A protein has these predicted regions:
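Hydrophobic helix-coil surface modules that form long, contiguous segments used
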Residues: 2, 7-156, 185-188
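Second-shell loop/turn segments in exported
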Residues: 7, 87-96, 172-173, 232-235, ...
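Beta-strand-rich binding/interaction modules
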Residues: 31, 291-292, 305-307, 311-376
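Zinc-dependent metallopeptidase catalytic helix centered on the HExxH motif
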Residues: 98-99, 137-205, 262
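Amphipathic alpha-helical substructures
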Residues: 227, 235-321
Length: 385
């Protein structure tokens, strides 16, 4: 939407450095991308403010903001100054809430690599979205500050965008999941890092519900070349399903290879543009395996598995399990964990079976009679029942 306010080539593949020289009433503070070069009060009760970002960025994340701001320096992270810009009446709550950005920024520097810009400003604004990841100058909605730090995950999402979406950008809009899916899962990773695996599972289960609900309304792949209204791509396929693809990829290649692959992908495309196949190649190199089948079924094919799990009463301490894929079309391929819980709830055991066909069966050792068999107890698979 940048072309609605700024004459520009409004496409993620056309990046530019920016200078914003703004003359505004002198009671306003002005913030924009990059580093402030000048702030001068003029004779007519106006003020000239000059901001410059020399690192080329997509025009969708170029921005200026002017308001009666309270401004706080929150600290340096790896030499990057972090500031908070909030309406003066929200000064106390806003400074407290936005100060979280310092620890969030440190997490992503450690996980992905060096921060691509020279400052990070977090700005209360009238954005139509919950947040907007403007390069080095993130905007959050007006009610994002209340003194409770309730928008920690939103801040993490927008900070993650500084690497994925702003610096390493999608080559075209069809591959926007490389921005939105990565930022969504980036927030998941941060929340897991800070609060533990249970918080990650809770977030992923909510995201899974959003994907399933969307797929019930619209059958479409993550990379959907039929779309002509680009705003229609801002949907759960790009955000939540994109995050789920990354989560399943993490299991497929392993923890260290996943992290290495993300870092290698970012290092290769920092400041540039990429397609899904570029990310696939980076993950194949890191994971030392062919992932063509994985990307075909999760990115280029619509839908997800719909599963039914059956089991027989154990005989001679052996339990027969049957997994059926009920969705239309061919089978998906995935590992599935199945957790049996005894009728009295005191015993449990988990097995992993490889599902490659519409029906998969396995016989396993089991010392008790299951009262239930729970599919995917540790939240690793995108599926519905």
């Amino acid at each position: 939407r940048a072309h609605h306010w700024l004459p520009c080539v409004d496409h993620p593949s056309d990046k530019a450095s920016v200078d914003f020289i703004v003359t505004a009433p002198d009671h306003y503070q002005v913030v924009a991308n990059g580093i402030q070069l000048e702030e001068t009060n003029l004779d007519d009760e106006t003020k000239l403010t000059h901001w410059r970002e020399t690192t080329p960025l997509p025009m969708k994340v170029a921005v200026i903001g002017a308001a009666r701001f309270g401004v706080q320096y929150a600290g340096d992270v790896a030499g990057i100054p972090v500031t908070s810009w909030v309406y003066r009446q929200d000064r106390e709550a806003g400074f407290y809430d936005y100060a979280l950005a310092t620890e969030i920024l440190q997490f992503f520097i450690d996980y992905i690599g060096p921060y691509p810009y020279r400052k990070l400003a977090n700005v209360q604004s009238k954005t139509r979205y919950g947040g907007m990841e403007n390069a080095s100058n993130i905007f959050y909605y007006e009610n994002s500050v209340d003194g409770s730090r309730s928008e920690e995950a939103l801040i993490a999402h927008e900070v993650a965008h500084q690497w994925f979406g702003n610096s390493a950008s999608e080559q075209n809009w069809f591959h926007i999941w490389l921005s939105e899916g990565f930022a969504t899962y980036g927030a998941d990773l941060y929340m897991e890092h800070k609060y533990g695996r249970e918080r990650l599972a809770d977030r992923l289960q909510t995201e899974r519900q959003q994907v399933v609900a969307f797929s019930n309304r619209k059958v479409a792949p993550v990379v959907d070349a039929t779309v002509t209204n680009w705003n229609a791509l801002l949907n759960p396929n790009s955000y939540q399903k994109g995050a789920w693809v990354l989560h399943m990829l993490r299991r497929q290649v392993g923890e260290q290879a996943f992290r290495n692959g993300l870092r290698q992908y970012y290092a290769l495309f920092q400041g540039g543009n990429a397609l899904t196949e570029d990310f696939q190649r980076a993950m194949e190199a890191a994971g030392k395996q062919d992932l063509g089948w994985f990307f075909r079924q999760w990115i280029y094919r619509p839908g997800h598995p719909r599963l039914s799990v059956e089991w027989d009463k154990p005989r001679r301490k052996r339990l027969r399990l049957k997994v059926s894929q009920l969705q239309d079309g061919p089978a998906f391929r995935f590992p599935l964990d199945l957790k049996a819980v005894s009728t009295d709830g005191t015993e449990s055991e988990t097995w992993t079976i490889e599902v490659n066909e519409k029906t998969a069966e396995a016989t396993v050792k089991c010392k008790f009679e299951p009262g239930q068999v729970v599919p995917d107890p540790d939240t690793w698979l995108l599926f519905s029942k």
